[in-house]
Design a protein with these regions (language model features):
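Conserved N-terminal ligand/cofactor-binding loop architecture of enzyme catalytic domains
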Residues: 44-125
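Short aromatic-enriched loop/helix-cap "lid" or pocket-rim segments at secondary-structure transitions
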Residues: 56-58, 181, 235-236, 245, ...
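Radical SAM [4Fe-4S] cluster-binding motif and immediate context
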Residues: 242-290
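A short, charged/proline- and glycine-enriched loop
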Residues: 5-12, 134-137, 267-270
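Short, solvent-exposed secondary-structure capping/transition elements
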Residues: 23-24, 256
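Glycine-rich beta-alpha loop elements in corrinoid/cobalamin-binding modules
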Residues: 11, 19-22, 28, 32-52, ...
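Accessory recognition modules or surfaces
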Residues: 5-16, 20-23, 56-63
Length: 290
């Protein structure tokens, strides 16, 4: 009788959350997936930004996803948790900006609050229910602007269903606001690791150390917890040779795209990201991430 061998199960989840652009795949997730595959680590990519775009499309509000969100409206949408379940009180300036955004988008304030208080909690619950998070030992979030609260909120929920899972955060936001990494860890106990700088040089070694319950690798740019204290390996993770960055794997994006029935573009600016350089080409500006 022929023995059937079960395919290895990925133990790492790579996640991008709203409001990451829905017009194209995440180059961050694509690169990290390829890098982990080179190291023999299987991972699943989750494009929850696309799923959220799809949810907004159901209620005719998908145009706001690809809008330029003023006053960090995107962060406001996901701000109920982890901070509180309260609606909160806006100052007059912030509220007026929100009203202006609603008017320009052609939707009512009531609908904005419905997205925040009904659609998003249901969306987060569906993510938890549709995936077996107990199968993963590590979940990694790539952060940019407009993704902070969505990522924190989801990480908190995943930790609730699988307290043993380790959470790793990194991305463009941490490169600009390096002082925020330990502060986020101090405030949010569901964050286990923060990578400061480029992910390629450290991600596979870090995940292998987590899987083997070994000490944090002696590589720059890693914030971690030890005996209740937040520690760092010091420095910044830096990829000094772009040729060492692998070709991004966008398979998960297109599989999800097709499974949702999108046969045409979901936005007139749809694109395929490629990377030819990283950082400020003049060597001057810290916020430059192109």
């Amino acid at each position: 009788m022929k023995t059937m061998h079960k395919a290895p199960t990925p133990t790492t989840a790579l996640i991008t959350t709203p409001f990451a652009p829905a017009e194209g795949p995440s180059i961050q997730l694509g690169i990290l997936k390829s890098r982990l595959e080179e190291a023999g680590i299987l991972s699943d990519n989750f494009y929850f930004n696309i799923k959220f775009f799809h949810e907004l499309k159901k209620i005719g509000c998908h145009d706001i996803y690809n809008s330029t969100l003023p006053a960090l409206v995107s962060e406001w949408f996901f701000s109920n948790v982890p901070f509180s379940r309260e609606r909160g009180i806006f100052n007059l300036e912030a509220y007026s900006r929100l009203e202006s955004f609603a008017f320009a988008s052609g939707i009512t304030m009531d609908k904005l609050f419905r997205i925040r208080e009904e659609i998003i909690p249901r969306f987060i619950d569906s993510i938890i229910d549709e995936h077996d998070w107990e199968n993963y030992s590590t979940v990694c979030f790539t952060l940019s602007y407009a993704q902070l609260n969505a990522s924190f909120r989801l990480a908190k929920k995943i930790k609730e269903v699988n307290p043993c899972i380790k959470t790793v955060f990194g991305g463009a936001f941490s490169q600009i606001h390096d002082e925020s990494c330990p502060e986020f860890m101090r405030v949010f106990d569901f964050i286990d690791y923060f990578i400061l700088g480029d992910g390629e040089p450290v991600i596979s070694d870090l995940l292998e150390s987590i899987a083997g319950n070994k000490p944090v690798p002696n590589l720059p740019g890693i914030f971690y917890r030890e005996n209740g204290k937040i520690k760092t390996t010091g420095g910044v993770s830096f990829l000094n040779d772009m040729n060492k960055s692998p070709i991004p794997d966008y398979t998960s994006y297109f599989n999800l795209y097709r499974s949702m029935g999108y046969s045409e573009r979901i936005h007139h600016r749809q694109y395929m990201p490629i990377e030819m350089s990283r950082g400020c080409i003049w060597g001057q500006h810290k916020p430059c991430l192109l």
